[in-house]
Amino acid sequence: MSTADTTAAAAIDDPNVSSTKRITSVRRTAWDEPTGARLAMRYGLLVVITLLVLFPVYTTVLGAFTPSNRVLENRLLPGELTFDVVRNAWTEGRLGRYLANSAVVALVVTLFQLVTSMLSGYAFAHLRFPARNGVFYLFLATLLVPFEATVVVNLDTVQWLGDESSIFGGLNSLQGLAMPFLATAVGTFLVRQALLDLPRDLIDASRLDGLGHLGFIRRVAMPLVRPTLGALALFSFLSTWNQYLWPRLVIS
């Protein structure tokens, strides 16, 4: 009998140990030291899940190096490989420029969402103004409206704000691609919830030290809610990078 089994047995036999601790000790024994069959089943399941996740990536890479006339043959194993497709994408298709544009727009949107979410989240968490909760719930209600329902209005707004030479960009511009996504209700909600967990004594101490609202946000709040901001930045960048409908409409 292993040491863990001996400890679990002792915990079960000890009348001074509560029933909750007995169950916990038995559960820990079963999963901390799995048998060979259970360990093989666990790793087998992980391998299957990994293959399912990587299969679309594999087919995409395989299709990129397969001649155009053989892409639809649905072959799992690589046959004739060529770099012509990738080369044409970079030269004739200007893929490098498109990737750079996507990166610039995604970075700008991420930066603006972090700033606007931090400011609005702080306002809803620690500032006192009339109808604060009502305005916050109105922010959250915008999440119920799908983006497709506002596409026409956003498109008209971007077109009305100006052409490519104006500061707002308009259609066929990087500003037009980023404009509808510079602020997000999801970011406001996440930052507000994180700021509500800060102790009130910390805020009062910062006031005694002479920090204003912006000073508190920059020196105290931002370092403490860094995990939330990191998650928001990752979500914002990926969602902006993966957009298709809005760029397809704005860029003609």
Model-derived regions, located:
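Transmembrane alpha-helical segments of polytopic membrane transport and secretion proteins
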Residues: 1-46
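A structural signal for multi-pass alpha-helical bundles of membrane permease subunits
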Residues: 38-252
